[in-house]
From Swiss-Prot:
SMART domains assigned: NGF
Organism per entry: Crotalus durissus terrificus
Name of protein: Venom nerve growth factor
Disulphide bridges, residue numbers: 136-201, 179-229, 189-231
Phylogenetic lineage: Eukaryota, Metazoa, Chordata, Craniata, Vertebrata
Expression tissues: Expressed by the venom gland.
Annotated localization: Secreted
Length: 241
């Protein structure tokens, strides 16, 4: 009888040890996944640093309950989405304020700019040496509140403006490069022989990974943003004979 009782107790303990925990079966992106370990949270905050060097004087991230009811910030994003390096892009950053364009510039702190594109400090195209100029003049800007974009398949998708991570709200910023003027000189691009060539400056695009909305879930997609300013030239028709 004692051997039978011993066997039943062992079987009962094995059953308890093998029973799956309920939190292991929670689908990715659900609110329950916000209860992560301290190690996972630390990795998430590292991924959210602007240029991996956030100014310590930035204000604390806004709480989700401070946002308007029904906003996209109420959709919780799983921090695990930020742990894979292939999803990280130097042109897409998550921060409470627009990052500086370079280490030498100060960040922009303008509370009135939240409802439009946030433009950081701009300056004329630098001249490194006397007599050296750029064919086209470009400007770098941090773009916020981007609500829609074209994905790599040509479809119009919804871009997440605010990201709710562990009940903290971060804004998604895009570093874009645009042409300042399609004709920096009256004849088109600077330095082009206008006697034989037509020229103009135009903005080109690239695709970056960004957080977008798919139903009520957040997902990574390649979207198109402005990335460079180039000169386009074409030969003028010449009459021979």
């Amino acid at each position: 009888m004692s051997m039978l009782c011993y066997t039943l107790i062992i079987a009962f303990l094995i059953g308890i040890w093998a029973a799956p925990k309920s939190e292991d079966n929670v689908p990715l992106g659900s609110p329950a996944t916000s209860d992560l370990s301290d190690t996972s949270c630390a990795k998430t905050h590292e991924a959210l640093k602007t240029s991996r060097n956030i100014d310590q004087h930035y204000p604390a991230p806004k709480k989700a309950e401070d946002q308007e009811f029904g906003s996209a910030a109420n959709i919780i994003v799983d921090p695990k989405l930020f742990q894979k390096r292939r999803f990280q892009s130097p042109r897409v950053l998550f921060s409470t304020q627009p990052p500086p364009l370079s280490r030498d510039e100060q960040s922009v702190d303008n509370a009135n700019s939240l409802n439009r594109n946030i433009r950081a400090k701009r300056e004329d195209h630098p001249v490194h040496k006397r007599g050296e100029y750029s064919v086209c003049d470009s400007v770098n800007v941090w773009v916020a509140n981007k609500t829609t974009a074209t994905d790599i398949r040509g479809n119009l998708v919804t871009v997440m403006v605010d990201v709710n991570i562990n009940n903290n709200v971060y804004k998604q910023y895009f570093f874009e490069t645009k042409c300042r003027n399609p004709n920096p000189v009256p004849t088109g691009c600077r330095g082009i022989d206008a006697r034989h060539w037509n020229s103009y400056c135009t903005t080109t695009n690239t695709f970056v990974k960004a957080l977008t909305m798919e139903g009520n879930q957040a997902s990574w997609r390649f979207i198109r943003i402005d990335s460079a300013c180039v000169c386009v030239i074409s030969r003028k028709n010449e009459n021979f004979g």
